Amino acid sequence: MAIEIEIPPEWKKFRYRGKTLEELLNMPMDEFIGLLPARQRRSLKRGLTMAQVKLLAKIRKVRQKKLTGKKAIIKTHVRDMIILPEMIGLTIAVYNGKEFIPVRIVPEMIGHYLGEFSPTTKRVQHGEPGLKATRSSMFISLK
């Protein structure tokens, strides 16, 4: 199944396990699965969940209609979907538990999970120590 994608010049040099992007797009799914790392290969060989199948259907629908702008952004909660070559060039908004984080899919992301690009936690930024902030602050004199 050949997929029609406009390939920018900077993507022409990309190779995944020795295969060019055009070869990956024209490759049958079984052959592509063989190129993936063991964890992703096992996951795809076991089959896709209903949610993953629905996401792929949405992706194919957007590709078929060639939508652009806001309508081309696909929202999903499916963080465990492996990025496939047919997703390249799309923007997928991945839910992180609070909001949808837009993720632009580029060739370097092939074989990774969508959830890897939408962090669920923020880095903790502690405030200044004040009264009752820590045990040692009990002995700081009040001004």
UniProtKB/Swiss-Prot annotation:
It comes from the Archaea. Keywords: Ribonucleoprotein, Ribosomal protein, RNA-binding, rRNA-binding. Disulfide bonds: none annotated. GO terms for biological process: ribosomal small subunit assembly; translation. One of its GO terms (cellular component) is cytosolic small ribosomal subunit. One of its GO terms (molecular function) is rRNA binding. InterPro entries: Ribosomal_uS19 (IPR002222), Ribosomal_uS19_CS (IPR020934), Ribosomal_uS19_euk/arc (IPR005713), Ribosomal_uS19_SF (IPR023575). Protein S19 forms a complex with S13 that binds strongly to the 16S ribosomal RNA. Belongs to the universal ribosomal protein uS19 family. This is Small ribosomal subunit protein uS19.
